[in-house]
C-alpha cells in the first residue's frame, strides 16, 4: 500500500513505476484535498494501468483503492498572525555555489509576497509588486533586477520568462530575505548610487520620479506564529476559540483546539501530548475558561508549538464518535470510487456498527472496512472490535503506529503490535502494518539499518503501508524484495528453518 497524493498522480511515469514494482493498493487520505483531486488521483492510477497494458507490461492485477476517513483528529487551533521576513533558500554545492536557480514570479496583481506550491510548477514563491503595475511589460528576458534584501545583502534577480502582462517568471542564485517595501531596480540604472545608507529604504522615501523607475515589493502574507516552550513552562488550552498567543509577563502562553468539548473530559494530572509526543505535559488546574498545563518534556531544549499539530489525551476517556458529519458526506464519493474505507480512531465496536449502518444506507453493505487501531481505547477494546468486525462482510485492521505510540507509550509499541498481529491471525482477519515503514529511504534515498529489519517484519501482515517521498519507488522495490525473501521462511508468526546460504542465495553465481 502506498499513499498517493495529487502531486504523484500528475506524474504518469512515477505511477507506472509504482505499479510495476509492487504497489497493490493506493491509499488516499481524505484529510487533504477534495473530491475533485481524489477523482484525478483515481483516474490517473487507472490510466497508468491501461498504458502498461498497451506497452505489454501488464501487471496482472488491478490496484485497489483505499480511502481514509479523516475522523475526529484533535488538533491545535489557529495562532495569531504576524508578518515576518520571507526566506527564499538556494541550495549550494560544496564550493558554495548555487546548484540551480530557485524560480519564482513577479506578479503585479498579487496581494501578497509568499511561498507557493503549485503541482507541476517548479516556481516556489511570488513577489507582489505594489507600484507601477505596467512596468513589468517593459522587462526583457535575461534582464537583471537588483535589490538589497531585509539584511542589507546585495542580490540579483534574473528575468526568465514573460507569462503575461502581469506575471514574470524569475530566478535567484543566492539566499534572499524579503520584506515589504524592498526596492527592485533594473541593473542598468546603477542601484549602488541610489542605495540609501541603511536597508530600511521604502516607498515613502523615494520621489515620484524615482518610484517610476523602480519596482516596490508588496506586503508579506502574514503567517501563524510559533510558541516556544520548555520544561517547567505553563501553557493554557482555552475552551473557547482564542488565537494562540505567546507568554507575557503576567500570563502564560495559550492555545485553543478544534474540538473544545473534549476538554470537559480532562482531569487533574492527566497527560496531554503535543505534536506526536514531541512535547509532553500534565494538567495542573482546570476552570471554566481553560485547562492549565505544565510542560514536562523536553527537559533541556525548547520545542515549538505550531497550529494544526495533533493533541493526544492518553489518560482521558474522551467518548467521541469515530465518524464525523464530514466523513458521512465523503462516504458518498468513497463507495462509488474506492475498494475499501479506512476508519480513523476506531475506539469501540460501536464505531464499526455506525460505519456499517451508513454503508447499508448508501446501498453498499459489502463494501470493505479497515479499522485503524491508533488509540489507547482502541487497544483496550480490540477483542470486541475484532468480534464485531467478523460480522461485517469485508473487514480488516490497520496498525497505525504513529498515534498508537504516542497514546500507549513508545516503549510499549512493539508488544502491542505483536499482540494485534497474533489476535488478528487467531480470528483470520487481514492486517495492514503502517507508519514510518522505510520512511528514511523514501525521503532521503538511503535506509537505516533498523528500518530494514522493521520492514522485513511486515511479512507478518497481509499488507504494508508506505508513505510518499522523493524515493518512494526505491522504497517499494526494496520492500517488495524484503517481503518476498521473508516469505520463504516465515508463515505469519511461524518460522520455517532452511539452509542460510540457500535461503539468501549468498553464493549464487
Label the predicted regions.
Residues 1-509:
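Non-catalytic helical/linker scaffolds that mediate oligomerization, partner binding
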Amino acid at each position: 500500500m502506498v499513499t498517493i497524493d495529487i502531486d504523484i498522480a500528475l506524474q504518469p511515469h512515477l505511477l507506472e513505476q509504482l505499479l510495476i514494482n509492487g504497489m497493490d493498493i493506493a491509499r488516499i487520505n481524505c484529510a487533504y484535498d477534495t473530491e475533485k483531486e481524489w477523482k484525478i488521483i483515481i483516474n490517473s492510477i487507472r490510466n497508468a494501468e491501461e498504458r502498461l497494458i498497451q506497452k505489454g507490461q501488464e501487471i496482472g492485477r488491478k490496484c485497489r483503492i483505499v480511502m481514509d476517513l479523516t475522523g475526529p483528529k484533535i488538533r491545535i487551533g489557529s495562532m495569531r498572525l504576524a508578518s515576518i521576513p520571507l526566506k527564499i533558500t538556494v541550495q549550494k554545492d560544496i564550493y558554495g555555489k548555487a546548484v540551480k536557480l530557485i524560480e519564482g514570479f513577479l506578479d503585479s496583481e498579487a496581494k501578497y509576497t509568499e511561498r507557493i506550491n503549485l503541482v507541476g510548477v517548479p516556481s516556489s514563491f511570488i513577489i507582489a509588486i505594489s507600484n507601477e503595475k505596467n512596468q513589468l511589460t517593459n522587462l526583457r528576458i535575461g534582464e537583471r533586477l537588483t535589490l538589497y534584501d531585509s539584511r542589507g545583502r546585495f542580490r540579483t534577480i534574473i528575468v526568465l520568462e514573460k507569462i503575461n502582462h502581469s506575471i514574470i517568471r524569475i530566478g535567484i542564485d543566492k539566499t534572499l530575505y524579503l520584506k515589504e517595501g524592498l526596492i527592485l531596480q533594473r541593473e542598468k540604472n546603477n542601484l549602488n548610487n541610489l542605495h540609501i545608507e541603511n536597508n530600511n529604504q521604502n516607498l515613502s522615501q523615494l520621489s515620484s520620479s524615482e518610484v517610476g523607475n523602480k519596482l516596490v515589493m508588496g506586503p508579506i502574507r502574514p503567517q501563524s506564529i510559533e510558541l516556544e516552550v520548555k520544561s517547567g513552562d505553563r501553557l493554557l488550552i482555552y475552551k473557547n476559540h482564542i488565537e494562540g498567543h505567546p507568554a507575557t509577563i503576567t500570563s502564560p502562553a495559550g492555545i485553543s483546539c478544534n474540538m473544545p468539548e473534549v476538554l470537559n473530559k480532562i482531569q487533574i494530572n492527566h497527560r496531554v501530548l503535543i505534536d506526536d509526543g514531541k512535547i509532553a505535559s500534565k494538567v495542573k488546574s482546570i476552570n471554566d475558561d481553560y485547562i492549565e498545563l505544565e510542560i514536562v518534556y523536553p527537559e533541556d531544549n525548547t520545542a515549538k508549538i505550531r497550529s494544526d499539530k495533533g493533541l493526544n489525551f492518553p489518560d482521558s476517556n474522551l467518548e467521541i464518535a469515530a465518524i464525523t458529519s464530514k466523513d458521512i458526506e465523503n462516504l458518498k464519493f468513497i463507495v462509488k470510487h474506492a475498494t475499501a474505507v479506512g476508519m480513523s480512531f476506531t475506539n469501540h465496536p460501536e464505531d464499526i456498527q455506525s460505519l456499517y449502518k451508513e454503508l447499508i444506507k448508501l446501498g453498499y453493505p459489502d463494501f470493505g472496512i479497515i479499522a485503524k487501531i491508533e488509540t489507547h481505547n482502541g487497544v483496550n477494546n480490540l477483542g470486541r472490535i475484532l468480534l464485531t468486525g467478523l460480522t461485517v462482510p469485508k473487514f480488516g485492521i490497520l496498525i497505525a503506529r504513529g498515534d498508537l505510540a504516542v497514546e500507549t507509550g513508545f516503549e510499549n509499541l512493539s508488544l502491542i503490535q505483536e499482540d494485534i498481529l497474533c489476535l488478528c491471525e487467531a480470528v483470520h482477519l487481514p492486517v495492514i502494518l503502517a507508519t514510518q515503514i522505510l520512511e528514511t529511504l523514501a525521503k532521503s534515498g538511503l535506509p537505516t539499518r533498523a528500518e530494514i529489519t522493521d520492514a522485513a517484519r511486515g511479512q507478518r501482515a497481509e499488507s504494508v503501508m508506505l508513505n510518499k517521498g522523493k524515493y518512494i519507488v526505491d522504497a517499494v522495490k526494496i520492500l517488495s524484495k524484503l517481503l518476498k525473501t521473508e516469505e520463504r521462511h516465515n508463515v505469519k508468526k511461524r518460522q520455517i528453518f532452511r539452509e542460510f546460504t540457500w535461503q539468501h542465495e549468498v553464493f549464487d553465481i
